[in-house]
């Protein structure tokens, strides 16, 4: 029973459509009708600006972290934190409060790792920032960090680097989260191939993307 409640709470936490609600309540803007139509951090930054984007990022990360820490907070020591965190990502991606159309799972996945393996998250964040600097694309940075996450979760424990030993639940979760993130970025990948992906005004844009101007 406790397990079902934890899963449900994590899913509902994850389901909070931060960007969508911030847009509606504070700016009177429906994010689905602007930019990429996505309700995650990137589109929130692009359409509503820095404050709203930062708030969305932090809250979306916090959703994952809080969900991951739920078993600890309620003293359910036999429940795996990472498994509960996973349901927050599921909620974030398919939110019950927003017609099951959610974000691309990046921020909330980061939040889950922050609660479970913070140093490992720091490593992936470094990969993300480096890729972002070299190519100026949030999508490519997310995809690269996801692929590196899968490779590293399979190899690091062998070297006892950042991850002490193999944790099959963490491994499965990372692989599934990476798969969700990659699947949610299909459109971005097409644009990267066509060299028309949206850029951020930072970094080197090494792959010379030339996005069409925004409508």
Curated annotation (Swiss-Prot):
One of its GO terms (biological process) is phospholipid biosynthetic process. One of its GO terms (molecular function) is acyl-phosphate glycerol-3-phosphate acyltransferase activity. Its EC number is 2.3.1.275. InterPro entries: G3P_acylTferase_PlsY. It comes from the Bacteria. Its main location: membrane. It catalyses: an acyl phosphate + sn-glycerol 3-phosphate = a 1-acyl-sn-glycero-3-phosphate + phosphate. Pathway: Lipid metabolism; phospholipid metabolism. It is found in: Cell membrane. It is a multi-pass membrane protein. Pfam families: G3P_acyltransf. One of its GO terms (cellular component) is plasma membrane. Keywords: Cell membrane, Lipid biosynthesis, Lipid metabolism, Membrane, Phospholipid biosynthesis, Phospholipid metabolism, Transferase, Transmembrane, Transmembrane helix. The chain crosses the membrane at residues 3-23, 42-61, 68-90, 110-130, 134-154, 162-182. Catalyzes the transfer of an acyl group from acyl-phosphate (acyl-PO(4)) to glycerol-3-phosphate (G3P) to form lysophosphatidic acid (LPA). This enzyme utilizes acyl-phosphate as fatty acyl donor, but not acyl-CoA or acyl-ACP. Belongs to the PlsY family. NCBIfam families: glycerol-3-phosphate 1-O-acyltransferase PlsY (TIGR00023). Probably interacts with PlsX. This is Glycerol-3-phosphate acyltransferase. It comes from Streptococcus equi subsp. zooepidemicus (strain MGCS10565).
């Amino acid at each position: 029973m406790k397990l079902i409640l934890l899963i449900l709470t994590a899913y509902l936490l994850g389901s909070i459509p931060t960007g969508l609600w911030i847009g509606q309540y504070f700016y009177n803007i429906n994010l689905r009708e602007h930019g990429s139509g996505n309700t995650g951090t990137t589109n929130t930054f692009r359409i509503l600006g820095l404050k709203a984007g930062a708030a969305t990022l932090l809250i979306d990360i916090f959703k994952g972290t809080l969900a991951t820490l739920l078993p600890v907070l309620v003293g359910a020591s036999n429940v795996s934190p990472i498994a509960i965190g996973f349901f927050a990502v599921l909620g974030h991606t398919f939110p019950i409060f927003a017609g099951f159309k959610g974000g691309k799972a990046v921020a909330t996945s980061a939040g889950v790792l922050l609660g479970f393996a913070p140093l490992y998250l720091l490593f992936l964040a470094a990969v993300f920032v480096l890729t972002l600097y070299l190519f100026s694309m949030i999508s490519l940075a997310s995809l690269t960090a996801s692929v590196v996450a899968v490779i590293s979760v399979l190899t690091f424990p062998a070297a006892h680097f950042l991850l002490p030993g193999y944790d099959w639940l963490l491994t499965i979760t990372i692989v599934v989260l990476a798969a969700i993130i990659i699947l949610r970025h299909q459109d971005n990948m097409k644009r990267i191939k066509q060299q028309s992906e949206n850029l951020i005004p930072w970094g080197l844009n090494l792959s010379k993307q030339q996005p069409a101007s925004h409508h």
